[in-house]
From Swiss-Prot:
KW DNA-binding (keyword) present: no
Upper lineage: Bacteria, Pseudomonadati, Pseudomonadota, Gammaproteobacteria, Alteromonadales
Residue ranges constituting the HD domain according to the UniProt record: 59-252
Protein origin, superkingdom: Bacteria
Gene Ontology molecular functions: dGTPase activity
InterPro entries, A to Z: dGTPase, dGTPase-like, dNTPase_2, HD/PDEase_dom, HD_domain, PHydrolase_assoc_dom
Keyword rRNA-binding: no
Residue ranges with Basic and acidic residues bias: 7-28
Protein name as catalogued: Deoxyguanosinetriphosphate triphosphohydrolase-like protein
Entry-linked HAMAP family: dGTPase_type2
Annotated family: Belongs to the dGTPase family. Type 2 subfamily.
Record PANTHER family: DEOXYGUANOSINETRIPHOSPHATE TRIPHOSPHOHYDROLASE-LIKE PROTEIN 2, DEOXYNUCLEOSIDE TRIPHOSPHATE TRIPHOSPHOHYDROLASE
Region (Disordered): 1-28
């Protein structure tokens, strides 16, 4: 398929700017970087509860680190596979994907996502990656109705789960709750896919694909993940595979660094959960470097810890390979990046360490639970009387949606998911706390 079709935008542009010689993907990167949705990431913490000092990462600093790792992966692949240089394309494209990958995530992390998904259970559901696709293509006001109006290849790259939610949803056996405080995230996991409300944009992105490629790319299968009832997609584009690897590496390594600095993960936990597995790795580099990395990670000398973090990131980045799936015709689907098996196992061990000792930590789960209550309370209030409580511009979107017979509840999810953690908390206090003051400062923020 010609590269020009992947550089097309949904809405044609005739902007004539003096001496502007940027490539289409450089323009995409600029639009994302200067967007309000991207700026809001600075006020959404990467891991709830670790923000008690100024060292912690936000979703914005995380996205910047993912971008740096993503371009590092591309540079390594370009040297390792010179025949794939044309496919790797622009560094600005990969930066765009990495910078934008978390834009759709709501306040309060997974707690906010589950809460919105529950409140939207009869209206198409909610999921952070689906919301990212929606913001980029429809909501961000760079254009009147086409969002950031990004290139087709950029939109293909952001598709982590390329299928509409209606094809993926499997009804659970759990009854609906009678009280918001009873909501258990494990019983209401979001469907990982595109909202059906955005199926027209999804169709446009996939337009250049052959019938066979599209059918295979959007095919679904039962999930192998325990306690996840919904179906899962099977494939992603080449660009998306690089972005997802960069995200996984940043999550496993940099979030681990945060946890070590704050004393959440200890050297004894490392020796108990990581060392026994990795010392038997089939890769000699992992076996040889393990002890030194473990010692430096928990050193009181900051430069030694940073050296260990750099060694880990470099180890993963240089262990990425390109796989060929000849069942696809389109090169962007035929080729995917992945970690060598031993390094994939090592990365999973680190991710499980972060999940076990950080994400599942009761104090952090309490904050996530609190966020759930805030999000559900806000949604319930706005849904009860949208034309009374929503900001004027959101009221207008809600009315338009109602008049056109569209999903007006999606407008409520759009509004709440765009909030920062702090803004959502203040607005909740404004609505439900008798001691809250004027809402003048609230009206200025969104």
């Amino acid at each position: 398929m010609s590269s020009s079709v992947w550089q097309e935008r949904r809405h044609g542009e005739d902007k004539q700017r003096r001496n502007d010689h940027r490539s289409p993907f450089q323009r995409d990167r600029a639009r994302i970087l200067h967007s309000a949705a991207f700026r809001r990431l600075q006020a959404k913490t990467q891991v709830l509860g670790v923000g008690m000092n100024d060292f912690y990462r936000t979703r914005l600093t995380h996205s910047l680190e993912v971008s740096q790792i993503g371009t590092g992966i591309a540079a390594q692949l370009s040297r390792k596979y010179p025949e794939h240089k044309p496919l790797l394309g622009s560094m600005s494209l990969l930066e765009s994907l990495c910078l934008a990958h978390d834009i759709g995530h709501p306040p309060f992390g997974h707690g906010g996502e589950v809460a919105l998904n529950y409140m939207m259970r009869h209206h198409g559901g909610f999921e952070g990656n689906g919301q990212t696709f929606r913001i980029l293509s429809k909501l961000e006001p760079y254009t009147e109705a086409f969002g950031m109006n990004l290139c087709r290849r950029t939109m293909l790259g952001i598709l982590k789960y390329p299928a509409p939610q209606s094809l993926l949803f499997v009804a659970g056996s759990h009854p609906e709750i009678t009280n918001h405080r009873q909501l258990k995230p494990s019983q209401w996991p979001p469907v990982k896919g595109i909202f059906d409300d955005d199926s027209d944009i999804f169709d446009w992105v996939l337009e250049p694909l052959s019938v066979a490629d599209r059918a295979r790319f959007t095919s679904v299968q039962p999930s192998l993940q325990p306690n996840y009832p919904h179906l899962r997609t099977q494939f992603k584009s080449f660009d998306c595979s690089i972005m997802e690897l960069a995200d996984d590496i940043a999550y496993a390594v940099h979030d681990l660094e945060d946890a070590i600095v704050m004393g959440i993960v200890t050297a004894s936990q490392w020796q108990q959960d990581v060392a026994p597995t990795l010392k038997h790795s089939g890769d000699p580099w992992i076996r040889q470097e393990l002890a030194d990395i473990g010692t430096k990670l928990f050193s009181h000398e900051h430069h030694l810890r940073k050296d260990a973090i750099g060694t880990l990131v470099n180890g993963f980045v240089t262990a990425i390979i390109i796989n060929d799936d000849p069942a696809f015709e389109e090169p962007l689907l035929r080729f995917n990046a992945s970690l060598e098996p031993e390094f994939a196992n090592a990365l999973n061990v680190l991710k499980q360490l972060v999940f076990k000792y950080v994400i599942r930590k009761p104090e952090i789960q309490m904050l996530e639970y609190k966020g759930q209550q805030i999000v559900m309370g806000l949604f319930e209030a706005f849904a009860s009387d949208p034309e009374r409580l929503l900001p004027l511009n959101t009221q207008e979107r809600w009315r338009t949606s109602e008049q056109q017979g569209q999903n007006s509840h999606r407008v409520l999810a759009d509004y709440i998911s765009g909030m920062t953690d702090e803004f959502a908390g203040r607005l909740y206090q404004q609505l439900f706390s008798p001691k809250a003051g004027s809402n003048v400062e609230l009206s200025k923020e969104m």
